[in-house]
C-alpha cells in the first residue's frame, strides 16, 4: 500500500462464498499496522488467514489504471494487477489521478504498467481519448516521467498511450483494433499464437513454453480458454492504413516491430530508449489475455505471466 494511507484504519474487502462468514468483520475499518488474523467459517469448516500490509513509500513498479482503487478494476485488469503485486517486488497500484496529482512518489520507479481492457474494444485515437480521460489528463506527468528515464509496459488498449506522451514520431495510434465482451468471450478450440520471426532472441520471448518444431510461434492459451480477442495492432499493407510496408511504419512511428499476426500486422513493438528517455514495450495482440470466464488448466497460458516477467526484467535492467 502507498505509505500515504493510514494503516491503522484500512477497510478490507474480502470475497466470501455463499454462507461463509469472516471474523473480524468484512468492510470494517481495521488496524493493519501489525499482521491481522482473519478466520473464515463455512458450516463446520474454518480456515485462518494472516494478512500483512506493507507500506511502500517509493515503488519500483506501478500498475496504473483508471479507477481510484484496484478493487474497481474489471476481471481482466485485476488478474494482471494481482499478478504484478505478487511477483514484482516493491510494486503497488495507483490511479491516473494519483499520478496527475503527484500522490505517488515515482522517483525510484523503474516501470509503469497499464493493461487496459474495455468490453467491445477501443478503436482509434479519438475513441481512446473518450474512453480514458483520466489517462489523458495524466499525460503531462507521465511524459515528465518518461523524459527523465522512466519506462513503460503498455498492453492491450493501453498501447494507444505512447502517442499521448510524445513517444510516437507521427503521433499515431494502432490502426486496427477490436474486441469482444468478457461475459460472452469466445471459447477457443485450440491454443492461439502470434509470430516472432527475426526476434527470437529478444528478452521478451526467452524461456517460454514453446511448441516443438515452431521456434517462431508463441502460444498463449489452451483449448477451451475463453478469450475476448481484444486487439490493438498496426495493419501493414498497401490496401489501407497508411503503412505500405514495415520500413515505412518504422520510419514514421519511430517504433521497432517485435511480433506479428498471421496477416503480418505488428502485434508487439517497442520504442527504444533515446537520450534521457526511458523504454516503452507494447503488446497489442489479442493472444495476450489474462482472464478466462471459465477456469481452464494452464499450459501455454503460463507464457502470459512469463512474458510479462520478461518485460519487467528487460525494462528494469537493460
Residue ranges with predicted function:
Residues 310-318:
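C-terminal alpha-helix
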Residues 68-69, 118-119, 159-161, 264-265, ...:
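Short, solvent-exposed loop/turn segments at secondary-structure junctions
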Residues 289-308:
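A short acidic/glycine-rich loop-to-helix N-cap element
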Residues 60-62, 281:
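Conserved beta-strand elements of the Class I
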Amino acid at each position: 500500500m502507498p505509505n500515504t494511507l493510514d494503516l491503522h484504519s484500512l477497510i478490507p474487502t474480502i470475497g466470501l462464498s455463499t454462507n461463509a462468514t469472516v471474523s473480524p468483520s468484512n468492510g470494517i475499518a481495521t488496524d493493519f499496522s501489525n499482521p491481522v488474523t482473519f478466520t473464515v467459517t463455512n458450516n463446520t469448516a474454518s480456515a485462518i488467514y494472516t494478512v500483512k500490509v506493507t507500506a511502500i513509500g517509493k515503488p519500483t513498479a506501478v500498475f496504473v489504471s483508471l479507477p481510484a482503487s484496484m478493487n474497481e478494476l474489471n476481471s481482466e485488469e485485476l488478474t494482471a494487477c494481482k499478478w504484478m503485486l505478487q511477483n514484482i517486488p516493491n510494486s503497488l497500484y495507483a490511479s491516473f489521478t494519483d499520478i496527475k496529482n503527484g500522490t505517488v512518489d515515482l522517483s525510484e520507479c523503474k516501470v509503469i504498467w497499464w493493461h487496459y481492457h474495455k468490453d467491445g474494444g477501443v478503436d482509434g485515437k479519438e475513441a481512446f481519448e473518450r474512453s480514458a480521460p483520466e489517462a489523458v489528463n495524466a499525460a503531462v506527468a507521465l511524459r515528465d516521467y518518461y523524459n527523465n528515464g522512466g519506462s513503460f509496459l503498455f498492453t492491450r488498449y493501453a498501447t494507444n498511450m505512447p502517442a499521448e506522451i510524445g513517444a510516437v514520431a507521427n503521433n499515431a495510434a494502432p490502426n486496427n483494433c477490436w474486441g469482444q465482451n468478457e461475459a460472452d468471450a469466445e471459447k477457443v478450440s485450440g491454443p492461439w499464437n502470434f509470430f516472432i520471426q527475426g526476434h527470437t532472441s529478444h528478452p521478451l520471448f526467452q524461456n517460454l513454453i514453446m511448441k516443438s518444431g515452431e521456434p517462431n510461434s508463441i502460444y498463449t492459451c489452451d483449448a477451451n480458454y475463453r478469450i475476448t480477442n481484444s486487439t490493438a495492432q498496426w495493419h501493414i499493407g498497401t490496401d489501407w492504413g497508411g503503412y505500405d510496408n514495415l520500413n515505412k511504419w518504422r520510419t514514421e512511428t519511430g517504433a521497432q516491430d517485435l511480433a506479428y499476426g498471421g496477416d503480418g500486422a505488428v502485434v508487439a513493438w517497442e520504442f527504444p530508449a533515446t537520450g534521457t528517455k526511458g523504454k516503452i514495450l507494447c503488446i497489442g495482440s489479442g493472444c495476450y489475455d489474462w482472464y478466462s470466464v471459465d477456469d481452464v488448466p494452464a499450459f501455454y497460458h503460463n507464457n502470459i505471466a512469463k512474458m510479462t516477467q520478461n518485460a519487467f526484467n528487460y525494462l528494469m535492467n537493460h
